[in-house]
Amino acid sequence: MIAPLVCLDPGHGTPPAIGRQVEPIGPGSRELKIKDGGGALGEAPVALAIALRARRLLLARGYRVAMTRTGPTIHLGDGDGNIARARFCNRRHAALMVRIHADGSTDRSQHGFSTLVPAWHRGWTDDIYARSLRAGRALQRSALAATGAADRGVVQRSDLTGFNWADVPAVLVETGFMTNPTESRRLKTGAYQQRVALGLVRGIAAFVSG
């Protein structure tokens, strides 16, 4: 029996010249969205560190793992935007695509962990909506248990290109706020990154086995 494949997508890491380009927000859409706004200060390396830790834990549990990037910069080809990230996971028939990010806000007091999932949209996400929602709830629950972070909930989004082009269940975890001084310091520590990764992996396992 072939082990399930989990596709980890550490956010950002797109070269600025490419990130400023635009791409359709969904298949057949005339609405265009920037490929990569750059994220919060320090977000890209934190996302990668958590993803690499999650990969090690998943491999130890017998899962197969694919990653959209394993270094500072993404090199997928295919435009290197969020469409390319989704297609990378689609081609591998991933059991789940986990997009790993950290949040940001002009309000430095904002803090906590949230999981974004695709909103239902006919022709775009209708085939992955229910499974993505189930996965999102599983990851949010397990991540909170592992980290003790404040619960910002599971949020449905219709405006994320990486969701709208996905043909496999997909979630996006906002692991904390880089703009909150306390949370930013925590997210940069290996110990906390390991707790986040463990929470994600437990949630992934609960979803895949369910």
Q: Where do the protein language model's features map onto the residues?
A:
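Active-site-adjacent substrate-binding region
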Residues: I128-D159
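Sec-exported extracytoplasmic/periplasmic mature domains
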Residues: L52-Y63, N90-A94, A102, Q140-A149, ...
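Active-site-adjacent mobile loop/cap segments within catalytic or ligand-binding domains
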Residues: R99-D107, L116, A150-G210
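Mature extracellular/periplasmic domains of secretome proteins
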Residues: G81-A95, L160-W165
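Solvent-exposed loop/turn segments at secondary-structure junctions
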Residues: H12-P15, A40-L41, G71-H75, A102-D107, ...
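Active-site histidine-acidic residue metal-binding/catalytic motifs
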Residues: M1-A86, A119
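Soluble non-cytosolic domains of exported or imported proteins
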Residues: L41-A49, L76-I83, D126-R134, L187-R195
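Soluble periplasmic/extracytoplasmic beta-strand elements of cell-envelope proteins
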Residues: L5-D9, R64-A66, L96-H101, S114-L116, ...
